[in-house]
Design a protein with these regions (language model features):
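Structural boundary micro-motifs
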Residues: 1-112
Length: 112
């Protein structure tokens, strides 16, 4: 896959392999036979840490991620179905995303 500025990426940050993030490519530099990929939030990654990349953010979502604070139940080509009612959300209506790995990392778990 050829990476280009403006693509969305699902990746593991260099400093933490405990969770997965989603961001957008801001700049790409080739240095010593290695691509350095700068993201909008100032993260720097290499291809080794990429999981998926696409111009359509829906392509890199996974079931269990959270879109607009609701759990993704199903993913179709142009929409995601979220929440218990499986409401459709299109690309243009996506405002925020939390990956299921991020949610697992930050969740407070009760021992009963």
């Amino acid at each position: 896959m050829k990476l280009e500025v403006g693509m969305y990426v699902r990746y593991k940050p260099l400093l933490s392999s405990k969770y997965v993030k989603i961001n957008k490519i801001k700049e790409i530099e080739e240095k010593e036979n290695c691509l350095h990929i700068w993201l909008e939030d100032k993260d720097l990654i290499t291809e080794k840490y990429l999981i998926k990349a696409s111009y359509n953010i829906i392509d890199i979502l996974e079931e269990g991620d959270y879109v607009n604070n609701e759990r993704v139940e199903e993913i179709w080509k142009e929409i995601v179905l979220v929440g218990q009612e499986c409401r459709p959300i299109s690309f243009n209506n996506i405002k925020s995303i939390v990956t299921h790995e991020q949610m697992e990392q930050i969740a407070y778990k009760l021992d009963h």
